[in-house]
Structure formats: structure tokens, C-alpha cells
């Protein structure tokens, strides 16, 4: 599938964002820059397949691909009244305060975006349907700044091998846990890098007053080289990382497709 067509799909399907940001924010409704449905469409486009049309059952794509989408364009908390407020709000719609914080119990207003959106992967399904599964397809939306005026958002798409040794180890430990069946998979965390994701494309979506524009920074659908593990995780190994986890103590927001 051509790079130009992917660009056209993203821009065409996000064309309503200028109005959504304006009116959704007025009524304190969160705005999904690229929602789960669109992420599945994008996955189908670049893999030359069709969406599964499962509505919660079966694979997200007809070729056996499973799409996981997450976003760091997240709501914040009013520093005065404590209520949750849309990312794009300049003032709290409840009390008019202009100070915000990322967490309700946070001290100070320096950090306003939790950036803790995650992907949810079922440990049970990972093993139960592994033969039919082709791969995991991960996508993430990130604001280039945490300011309410931000109109530029990075969108990145990776694939994750279903036979990843680290993912298998993590999933088995999670499955054996009595507390939860779900892997709370954090973008850019140690589990992410040790699972050896492969970037297929990344770019920036700009929301103009009357349209959107997507520009690629990288696009290679044939890329099979896993991301380089950052220096901070270079000394980590899967066994010790998984053994150090306190299973069942879920943090952050995760998207279940």
C-alpha cells in the first residue's frame, strides 16, 4: 500500500477534528485524535487486508492481526475543584480555574498530562489463540506538547511478534497470577522494548483550522528491525523484569479492543 494512500486515509478520517476540538471541549468531552476504529482501519490499509468487523469478538483484521491503540492526549484535573477536564480546555468549565494537574492527588501544577495511556493484552487469549494470531499491531498518539493549544500530534505504528520471548514470559506470569488476566503494556516502558517491537511508520498529524495534515518522519512497511533498547534498559533481562512485577496492581489507562 502506498505511503500517499495511508496519508489520504489519515487526513480524510480526521478531517472533523477542528470542529470536534472546538465543540467537544466546550462541553468537556474528551477528543480522540485517532480512535480505536480508525487505528484498525489504518492497520487494514497498510497490511492490505480488511477489518474483522467483529465488534469485540474475533480478530481486528481478517488476516489475524490484533490492533492495540492508545493515546497520551489525556484529560487533566482542575487544581481548584478537582474535577476532570478535557486536554484542550484553557479553563475549568466547572469553576473557571486555569491551573491543572495530571493526577488528582498531585502537588503543584507543573505536570498536567499523566501520559500513562497503555495497551491491554489478554494473557489468556495470547496463548489460547496464538496459532490463529498473526501479530500484534500497536499504535500510539502523543501530543507534541501538553499545552491546551497543542495541535500537533505524533502517531506511530509498530508490530509485535506473537512469539516474542519477553511477551510470552510476561503473559505466562500474568496468567498464573490470581489477580488479573490482563497485561498492562506501557509504551516506551521496559516491557515494550524487551518485547522487540518493529516500527513501520511514524509522523505528525497537524490540526489546522479547517483541515488536518499528516507528514511522515519514517515509513517502511518492510522494516523488520526491532527498536534499539535504550541505555536505561540495556542491563535489564526478561526474567528479572517479570519476577519483579507485582501482578494485579494495575496503573494507568489501557485500551481494550
For each feature predicted by the language model, list its residue ranges:
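Nucleic-acid endonuclease domains
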Residues: 1-59, 63, 67-257
